[in-house]
């Protein structure tokens, strides 16, 4: 059985004060190759991760693979939701960790816990995650904010990164682990994040809001009109 790497016996949970988010190759061209989940869901979750990082003051580093070519540009929501994000241009390296400037940007944060998502999962997410583990980092891979061309490719990649010591997570778990409590001033902003991770959550918010409105305004039920 594989165990999470570089935690030295500690619980494999995200330390917000030690975390940096790496959003790799979430590009409009590559998104067109995704087959393991609906593309709009992938796009929304990648954008949600950027917003999570902003709410939690987590550094964000982005990069793209030849964005001037068929892979296309980064989706704009990422930098819109994380205006503090640092973009690192690569010189053609497929594995972002093979780019010295990218690794230097990670090291410059002084943080050792990486939250990684990338498209395609089996390459853009997996390669740097495995490399970072080998360099001593704690790595959390956000699988449902990383897309690839088939469900089989996703499952194979998940097995591979777990064997390497990477901790797999989903976007909702990342949000909840970082948020920690609803007893905070920005709770409404966190609630909005969940509506992008799973849109049905918006229905819960609307139902709750209406129930409060009925009580507050002593609204007469339709059956009593």
Regions found by a protein language model. Give the residues of each.
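Active-site acidic carboxylates
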Residues: 2-92, 108, 138, 155-162, ...
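Conserved donor sugar-nucleotide recognition element shared by glycan-biosynthetic enzymes
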Residues: 71, 98, 125
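A short acidic, amphipathic alpha-helical/loop segment
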Residues: 74, 101, 127-131
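Short, well-ordered alpha-helices that flank and scaffold nucleotide-derived cofactor binding pockets
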Residues: 80, 104, 130, 134
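Short phosphate-binding loop-to-helix
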Residues: 92-104
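Glycine-rich phosphate-binding loop signature in dinucleotide/nucleotide-binding domains
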Residues: 106-112
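A contiguous pocket-lining binding segment that forms or flanks enzyme active sites
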Residues: 113-171
């Amino acid at each position: 059985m594989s165990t999470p790497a570089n935690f030295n016996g500690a619980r494999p949970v995200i330390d917000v004060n030690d975390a940096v988010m790496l959003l790799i190759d979430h590009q409009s061209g590559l998104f067109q190759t995704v087959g393991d989940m609906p593309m709009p869901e992938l796009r929304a979750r990648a954008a949600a991760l950027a917003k999570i990082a902003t709410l939690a003051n987590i550094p964000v580093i982005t990069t793209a693979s030849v964005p001037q070519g068929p892979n296309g540009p980064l989706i704009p929501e990422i930098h819109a939701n994380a205006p503090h994000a640092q973009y690192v241009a690569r010189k053609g390296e497929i594995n972002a960790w093979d780019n010295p400037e990218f690794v230097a940007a990670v090291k410059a944060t002084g943080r050792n816990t990486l939250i990684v998502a990338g498209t395609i999962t089996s390459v853009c997410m997996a390669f740097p995650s495995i490399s970072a583990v080998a360099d001593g980092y704690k790595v959390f891979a956000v699988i449902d904010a990383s897309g690839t061309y088939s469900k089989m490719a996703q499952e194979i990649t998940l097995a591979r990164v777990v064997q390497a010591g990477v901790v797999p997570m989903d976007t909702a778990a990342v949000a909840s682990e970082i948020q920690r409590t609803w007893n905070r001033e920005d709770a409404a902003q966190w609630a909005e994040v969940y509506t992008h991770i799973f849109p049905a959550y918006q229905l819960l918010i609307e139902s709750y809001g209406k129930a409060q409105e009925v009580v507050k305004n002593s609204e007469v039920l339709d059956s009593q009109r």
